[in-house]
Amino acid sequence: MGTLLALVVGAVLVSSAWGGCVEVDSETEAVYGMTFKILCISCKRRSETTAETFTEWTFRQKGTEEFVKILRYENEVLQLEEDERFEGRVVWNGSRGTKDLQDLSIFITNVTYNHSGDYECHVYRLLFFDNYEHNTSVVKKIHLEVVDKANRDMASIVSEIMMYVLIVVLTIWLVAEMVYCYKKIAAATEAAAQENASEYLAITSESKENCTGVQVAE
C-alpha cells in the first residue's frame, strides 16, 4: 500500500510539474434542453514562442451539406453570426486575457435537435520568431448528436467501479492496520503488566527474606 501511495503522489507531482497545455477530445453527445461544452484545444509546440491566435467556428447541420460560419473570436471579442439556431445560445468558454489562445471552447445553452451535426473549430495562429513570423492553421472537427437522455459511456462506468473498488480496498487495509496496531499495543501492555508483576513479587520476596534475617539475628 505504501508503494501505491508513492505512485499516486508521484503522478500528482509529475502532472503539476508538466502543468502545460493538453489537447483533449470533446464529448460528442449533448442532452436536449441542457448546456453543452464543445471542446477545442490547440496547443503550441513550443510554449516559449510568442503567438497571437484567433478562431472561427463553422457548423453543418445534420441532413445538410454546407458548413456555415457561426462565430469568430479575436482580440477578446466574440463576433456571432446571425443564425436563429444559435441566437442567444453561444457563450465563449476558452482562453481569456491573452491573445495567445490555446483553449478555444464554447458553450451552447438550451441545446435543441437543430444543433446536431458537424462542428469545425478553425485555429489560426501567428508565431513570432526573432527574424520572421510564421502562420499556422489547424481544424478541429467535432460531430455532435443531441439525445433526449444522457447515456453513460463504458469509460465512466468502469471509472466509477474502479473508484468503489479502491475505496473498499483502502477501507479493508485501514481496518487491518487498526487491528494489527491494537493487538500490538495490547500485547505490549500485557507484557509490561507481567514484567511489573514479576518485579513486585521479586521485591516482596526479598523484603520477606530481609525481615526473616533480622528476626534470626535478634
Swiss-Prot record:
Q: Which residues lie on this side of the membrane: Cytoplasmic?
A: 180-218
Pfam families reported for this sequence: V-set
Topological domain, Extracellular: which ranges? 19-157
A biological process from GO: regulation of sodium ion transmembrane transport
InterPro entries, per database record: Ig-like_dom_sf, Ig-like_fold, Ig_V-set, Na_channel_b1/b3
Give GO terms: molecular function aspect only: sodium channel inhibitor activity; sodium channel regulator activity; transmembrane transporter binding
The main location class comes to: membrane
Q: Which residues belong to the signal peptide in this entry?
A: 1-18
Give the stretches traversing the membrane: 158-179
Expression by tissue: Detected in brain (at protein level). Expressed in brain, heart, skeletal muscle and spinal cord.
Q: Name one GO cellular component term.
A: sodium channel complex
Any keyword Oxidoreductase?
A: no
> Where in or outside the cell is it found?
Cell membrane; Perikaryon; Cell projection; Cell projection, Axon
Q: What does this protein do?
A: Regulatory subunit of multiple voltage-gated sodium (Nav) channels directly mediating the depolarization of excitable membranes. Navs, also called VGSCs (voltage-gated sodium channels) or VDSCs (voltage-dependent sodium channels), operate by switching between closed and open conformations depending on the voltage difference across the membrane. In the open conformation they allow Na(+) ions to selectively pass through the pore, along their electrochemical gradient.
Q: What is this protein called?
A: Sodium channel regulatory subunit beta-1
| Species whose genome carries this gene | Rattus norvegicus (Rat)
This protein's gene is called Scn1b
